[in-house]
Design a protein with these regions (language model features):
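Short S/T/G/P-rich N-terminal loop/turn motif that feeds into the first structured element of a domain
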Residues: 2-91, 97, 102-109
Length: 109
């Protein structure tokens, strides 16, 4: 049996009422086909676009036992992450993110 425990620490403390919409937390896991450090460089270069879309990055990191598997946790207004990922699919793929491996879990605040 595999037991997974996830503790989310509020690293981003914007008040929901400041955003004016329902907030969503995205837990995105996927595989990469480049070294993690290369993927991370691409990801960090995308930060201005994420910031412009009011998407907060709460966490990003490789799986402890397999650096080709990555998890990113994001918080944003409803639908904003979907819009960002659709608009930037080619840039995301260039980073080494294997798009067809993506698993997204969305939680409401």
């Amino acid at each position: 049996m595999v037991l997974r425990t996830l503790f989310l620490v509020p690293l981003y403390s914007r008040n929901k009422s400041d955003w004016g919409e329902e907030m969503e937390t995205y837990i995105v896991s996927f595989e990469i086909n480049k070294p993690y450090e290369d993927w991370l460089t691409h990801f960090e270069q995308s930060r201005p676009g994420l910031d412009a879309a009011d998407i907060a990055v709460l966490f990003r990191g490789p799986r402890k036992d397999d650096a080709s598997k990555v998890c990113v946790i994001l918080k944003a207004n409803e639908g904003e992450v979907d819009k960002f990922m659709e608009a930037n699919a080619s840039m995301i793929a260039e980073s080494g993110h294997v798009l067809e491996s993506t698993v997204v879990d969305v939680y409401k605040s």
